[in-house]
Design a protein with these regions (language model features):
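Residues at the starts of beta-strands that form the adenosine-phosphate
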Residues: 55-57, 134-135, 214
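Single conserved hydrophobic/aromatic residue that forms the stacking wall/gate
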Residues: 1-11
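Residue-level signal for inorganic ion chemistry
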Residues: 17, 43, 98, 111-112, ...
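Conserved alpha/beta core of the MobA/IspD/sugar-nucleotide pyrophosphorylase nucleotidyltransferase superfamily
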Residues: 165-247
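Conserved N-terminal catalytic core of the sugar/cofactor nucleotidyltransferase
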Residues: 8, 43-105, 186-191, 195
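Short, flexible, basic/aromatic active-site loop/helix in glycosyltransferases
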Residues: 148-173
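N-terminal glycine-rich phosphate-binding loop and ensuing alpha1 helix
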Residues: 12-66
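Conserved beta-loop-beta/alpha segment of the NTase-like Rossmann-fold superfamily
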Residues: 89-149, 168
Length: 247
């Protein structure tokens, strides 16, 4: 794989990279995962990094972008097997498709392509936690005080900040755990409809809700930002530029 570390061993690892979002808050005609960042599309930053540590990469993108991504990836000199599949209307449905496409592995790393500034240390910590606990979800402590408020803006409570974490990706799970979680979720959707699934915002929530497994967090990074607004693109350019200068 071309990368030597404590996480690089006989464990078979596959990555599911989610690049199917519309990115409406970016206010651009092009979806955020295809915007130019340091000379390449946003999603390609994650593909290149996970290629150093994954045996297989499943890129989940919008149906109309599958061919574009395939053509782009064919020009890349990647070590991992890479497949591109069409995603769905909801993130968790796209993630479920990605997990289904992953096979014959010990660990599945699920990552949002919009987090183009993720670094190898964050990925390795996620893997290390998953090997021990079955899950490793990148997270960082809150820096700010958080308030719970009603629709009128009246404060209802102030949670203890020390117990709260901002959740990121990658989210790494043992293959059997994440597959069982999504199988259970899929059964509920097929029998009761998609509304019965509730509001699912990440893969850890699927494991929390649809299995009896405990979810464990791993140390993320404040640089591992999610590209959501134009300001985030500026910040990401600064982060990646600084790393380039350090090399």
């Amino acid at each position: 794989q071309g990368y030597s570390s404590a996480a690089s061993d006989v464990y078979k690892r596959q990555a599911v990279i989610l690049a199917a979002g519309s990115g409406r808050r970016m206010n651009t005609p092009v979806a955020k995962q295809f915007l130019d960042l340091m000379g390449i599309p946003v999603f390609l930053h994650s593909v290149r990094l996970f290629d150093k540590i994954a045996d297989k990469i499943v890129l989940v993108t919008s149906p109309d972008a599958v061919e574009y991504c395939q053509n782009l990836l064919e020009k890349e000199e990647l070590c991992a097997e890479v497949i591109v599949i069409a995603g769905k209307s909801e993130r968790f449905l796209s993630s479920m498709e990605g997990v289904r496409a992953a096979s014959d592995c010990d660990l599945i790393m699920i990552h949002d392509a919009a987090r183009a500034c993720v670094d190898m240390e964050v990925i390795e910590r996620s893997i290390a936690s998953a090997r021990i606990h079955g899950s490793g979800v990148a997270a960082v402590p809150l820096k700010d005080t958080v308030k719970v408020a009603d629709q009128n803006g009246m404060v209802l409570s102030t949670p203890d900040r020390s117990t709260l974490r901002i959740i990121q990706t990658p989210q790494t799970f043992k293959h059997d755990i994440i597959c069982a979680a999504y199988d259970h979720l899929n059964h509920i959707i097929e029998t009761k409809g998609i509304k019965a699934a509730g509001s699912i915002t990440d893969d850890a929530m699927v494991v929390e809700t649809f299995t009896n497994q405990k979810v464990y967090l791993s140390e993320g990074s404040y640089e591992n930002i999610k590209l959501t607004t134009p300001e985030d693109m500026t910040a990401a350019h600064g982060i990646l530029s600084a790393r380039t200068r350090e090399l």
